[in-house]
């Protein structure tokens, strides 16, 4: 599962997904983004993480920001698929991509550090420096991006820089690097207040990485067919 021991052996440049990739239903996009790699260039380094957990949001359901109406701050949600929507959650930055249809989007909930010929050990080392724990110590690599704000901190993504922007493939992109997840878990989203459509199963997790996502949907007490579905 892990690729954290891969050594950098090439100067291949990453190839980002076209904007048209994001112009699809939010749930479809949320599933299809699993296994893709977010890459952010900082100086000479590409900081990279494999998407392992996403959440879909629709304008018409109460759990979404878009359901509160259009504002200048939320305008990216109402733009074409592939626009970046960033906001602050619990004091940290969060990353979303607009999907097909005004107000529909996907939240990148968590990821897993990705090391390959483009993003070598030096890139991982920089991500560890970017996102230490509360005592200033390096986090375990597996937990470095285990949450939406941890992900953005590790990758160095900031609301003022990227909100309402398109991808710039020289600096920030999402790349298809290989096989899609073998199994996907579908379950309810996290942090949705009571009465705000918290029952909707719009959260998707790469089953192979379930233990490293924001909250493991396969933890003790969870029942398949009631609490989650395996796709």
From Swiss-Prot:
Keywords, comma-separated and alphabetical: DNA damage, DNA repair, Hydrolase
Top-level class of the enzyme under EC nomenclature: hydrolase
UniProt keyword Acyltransferase, yes or no: no
Any one GO biological process: base-excision repair
EC numbers, comma separated: 3.2.2.-
InterPro entries from the UniProt entry: Formyl_transferase-like_C_sf, MPG, MPG_sf
GO molecular function: alkylbase DNA N-glycosylase activity; DNA binding
Domain of life of the organism encoding this protein: Bacteria
Keyword flag Transmembrane: no
Coiled coil: none
SUPFAM superfamilies: FMT C-terminal domain-like (SSF50486)
Cited HAMAP family: 3MGH (MF_00527)
Family: Belongs to the DNA glycosylase MPG family.
NCBIfam families: PRK00802.1-5 (NF002005)
Protein name: Putative 3-methyladenine DNA glycosylase
Organism: Pseudomonas fluorescens (strain Pf0-1)
């Amino acid at each position: 599962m892990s690729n954290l021991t891969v050594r950098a052996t090439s100067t291949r440049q990453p190839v980002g997904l076209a904007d048209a990739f994001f112009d699809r239903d939010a749930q479809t996009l949320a599933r299809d983004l699993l296994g893709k790699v977010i890459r952010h260039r900082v100086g000479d380094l590409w900081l990279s993480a494999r998407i392992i957990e996403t959440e879909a949001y629709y304008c018409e359901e109460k759990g979404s920001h878009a359901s509160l109406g259009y504002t200048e701050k939320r305008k990216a949600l109402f733009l074409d698929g592939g626009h970046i929507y960033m906001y602050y959650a619990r004091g940290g930055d969060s990353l979303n991509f607009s999907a097909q249809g005004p107000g529909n989007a996907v939240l990148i909930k968590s990821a897993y550090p990705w090391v390959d010929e483009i993003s070598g050990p030096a890139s991982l080392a920089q991500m560890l420096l970017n996102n230490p724990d509360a005592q200033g110590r390096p986090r375990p690599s597996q937990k470095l991006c285990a949450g939406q704000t941890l992900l953005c901190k590790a990758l160095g993504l900031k609301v003022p820089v990227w909100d309402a922007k398109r991808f710039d493939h020289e600096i920030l992109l999402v790349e298809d690097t290989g096989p899609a997840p073998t199994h996907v878990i579908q379950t309810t989203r996290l942090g949705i207040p009571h009465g705000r459509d918290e029952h909707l199963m719009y959260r998707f997790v790469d089953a192979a990485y379930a233990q490293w996502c924001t909250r493991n949907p396969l933890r003790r007490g969870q029942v398949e067919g009631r609490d989650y579905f395996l796709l």
